[in-house]
């Protein structure tokens, strides 16, 4: 099956800069919120819904980065401790980077996919949260797909249907076929899609839970 890239209007330089600034700010704020939710054990799972994680392929990588960043911060602080004007900015920058990585990790932990009486919540960290009502779902199937790194998040197949790919390590393993083309909100804007491909750490459990409602 061939796919094509969805064309989007080009932004001006100022529009692109504004978009990046807004997105960075929102990621920062959501990162702090994720840390708060993790510390106080308040995951975002709708009442009555079952949670399904998707962080396992990335967990070891993120933990290594966080540990190395922590060690690096301490070592650099010791090396430049005699020069306050250098030490303080580097320490602030190091702490900010460490907090950012923690927010990224905790964003996945406290915002899992959810399957419940009212539908499916498809998540990708703190940036993507797509509610799909059961009335909009035609089918939920297990389907493993390995996706090229260069392939965009939204593609259009030969049959004219747009597919959203929320991959982890270039892989998805669940397909949600929608009853009709449905608008979904993404970080770069709204896209209209007919299918959603996502990754779950336990695709069998996700599929079995979805079968209870479809």
Go through the PLM ranges and name each one.
Residues 98-144:
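Conserved beta-hairpin
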Residues 1-82, 190-195:
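N-terminal membrane-targeting/pre-transmembrane regions
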Residues 193-195, 201-214:
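Polybasic (Lys/Arg-rich)
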Residues 77, 177, 199:
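Residues in well-ordered beta-strands of folded domains
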Residues 125-195:
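Non-transmembrane, membrane-adjacent beta-strand/coil modules in membrane-associated proteins
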Residues 73-80, 88-111:
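Transmembrane alpha-helices and immediately adjacent membrane-cytoplasm interface residues
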């Amino acid at each position: 099956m061939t796919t094509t890239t969805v064309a989007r209007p080009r932004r001006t330089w100022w529009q692109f800069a504004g978009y990046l600034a807004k997105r960075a700010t929102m990621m920062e704020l959501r990162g702090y919120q994720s840390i708060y939710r993790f510390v106080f054990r308040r995951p975002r799972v709708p009442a009555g819904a079952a949670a399904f994680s998707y962080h396992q392929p990335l967990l070891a990588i993120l933990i290594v980065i966080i540990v190395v960043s922590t060690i690096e911060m301490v070592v650099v602080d010791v090396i430049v401790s005699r020069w306050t004007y250098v030490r303080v900015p580097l320490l602030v920058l190091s702490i900010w980077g460490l907090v950012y990585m923690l927010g990224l990790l905790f964003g996945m932990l406290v915002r899992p996919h959810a399957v419940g009486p009212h539908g499916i919540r498809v998540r990708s960290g703190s940036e993507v949260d797509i509610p799909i009502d059961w009335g909009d779902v035609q089918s939920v199937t297990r389907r493993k797909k390995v996706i090229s790194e260069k392939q965009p998040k939204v593609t259009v197949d030969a049959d004219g249907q747009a597919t959203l790919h929320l991959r982890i390590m270039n892989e998805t393993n669940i397909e949600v076929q929608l009853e009709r083309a449905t608008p979904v909100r993404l970080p770069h804007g709204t896209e209209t899609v007919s299918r959603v491909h996502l990754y779950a750490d336990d695709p069998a459990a996700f599929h079995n839970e979805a079968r209870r409602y479809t």
